[in-house]
């Protein structure tokens, strides 16, 4: 039976979470060579590589399994410290590393978890990923939980439907007047600038496809949820924006719908480790109770 040295596993987790050996060393209060040595010792112990040494480093299949183990051990240790307070020498708040999409972070997330974090003295380490790809962080064992658009959980985890984020195709009045003086035509949307969050953002593609428009389209790239709204309101392009995020802009007429009533509802799921302990289970209950206040209720 292998008994792991958790200092070695902590080094692996730090390298992956911090995106490199130098930052991992700073986070752990060690030299970079010491972190590298711990990774080498871990690889010698398990008999195979645990990291692919690229920029940034990422875990091998075995490395992902070890990171999954680390995440669950951290959560279970937190449970034990609550039952045996003397084990928690520093009395420091617990930290949860969570992956979620930028639009959730910009809209409903803070209201949904604020009370929980204050009452339970929890610090969040948030990793922003598009809702289409956030689950890769769970699969890699980098996070304790994840909000994403996929219903299927990774091995060892569960998923629960939180609700749906409602998106509307919007643009500024000036943009519409400039490009569509006789009214918005679906077929012409591909020929005017759109705004896309990043290469994994397929909402604009889906919007056009729902309208029967196939093929590519010209677009700006803007990897910021708040910046996306500002660019849209500034007349640089059209885009799919969370309805909840722009209620003020819609009320003031700074943004208008391209095609009124044409919406896309994106289901969002909460993924969490089955053996994640009481803290993660409590957060899950809290999210199920509160997330619906900021999302559209859907069956599922």
Swiss-Prot record:
One of its GO terms (molecular function) is sequence-specific DNA binding. NCBIfam families: argP, PRK03635.1, PRK13348.1. Keywords: DNA-binding, Transcription, Transcription regulation. Residues 21-40 bind DNA. Homodimer. This is HTH-type transcriptional regulator ArgP. Controls the transcription of genes involved in arginine and lysine metabolism. SUPFAM superfamilies: Periplasmic binding protein-like II, Winged helix' DNA-binding domain. Pfam families: HTH_1, LysR_substrate. It comes from Pseudomonas aeruginosa (strain ATCC 15692 / DSM 22644 / CIP 104116 / JCM 14847 / LMG 12228 / 1C / PRS 101 / PAO1). GO terms for biological process: regulation of DNA-templated transcription. It comes from the Bacteria. HAMAP family: HTH_type_ArgP. Belongs to the LysR transcriptional regulatory family. The keyword Cell membrane does not apply. Residues 4-60 form the HTH lysR-type domain.
């Amino acid at each position: 039976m292998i008994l792991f040295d958790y200092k070695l596993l902590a080094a692996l987790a730090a390298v992956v979470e911090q995106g490199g050996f130098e930052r991992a060393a700073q986070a752990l209060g060690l030299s970079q060579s010491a972190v590298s040595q711990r990774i080498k010792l871990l690889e010698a112990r398990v008999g195979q590589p645990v990291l692919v040494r690229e920029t940034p480093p990422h875990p091998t299949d075995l490395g992902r399994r070890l990171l999954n183990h680390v995440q669950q051990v951290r959560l279970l240790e937190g449970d034990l410290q609550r039952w045996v307070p003397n084990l928690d020498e520093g009395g420091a708040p617990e930290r949860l590393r969570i992956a979620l999409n930028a639009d959730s972070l910009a809209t409903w997330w803070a209201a949904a978890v604020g009370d929980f974090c204050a009452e339970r003295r929890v610090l969040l380490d948030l990793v922003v990923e598009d809702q289409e790809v956030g689950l890769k962080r769970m699969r890699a064992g980098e996070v304790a939980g994840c909000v994403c658009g996929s219903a299927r959980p990774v091995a060892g985890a569960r998923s629960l439907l939180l609700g749906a984020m409602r998106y509307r195709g919007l643009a500024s009045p000036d943009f519409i007047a400039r490009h569509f003086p006789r009214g918005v035509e679906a077929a012409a949307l591909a020929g005017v600038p759109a705004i896309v969050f990043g290469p994994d953002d397929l909402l604009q593609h889906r919007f056009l496809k729902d309208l029967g428009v196939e093929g590519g389209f010209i677009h700006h790239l803007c990897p910021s949820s708040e910046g996306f709204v500002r660019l849209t309101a500034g007349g640089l392009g059209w885009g799919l924006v969370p309805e909840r995020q722009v209620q003020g802009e819609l009320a003031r007429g700074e943004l208008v719908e391209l095609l009124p009533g044409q919406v896309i509802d994106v289901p969002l799921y909460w993924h969490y480790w089955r053996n994640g302990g009481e803290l993660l289970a409590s957060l899950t209950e809290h999210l199920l109770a509160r997330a619906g206040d900021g999302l559209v209720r859907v069956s599922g």
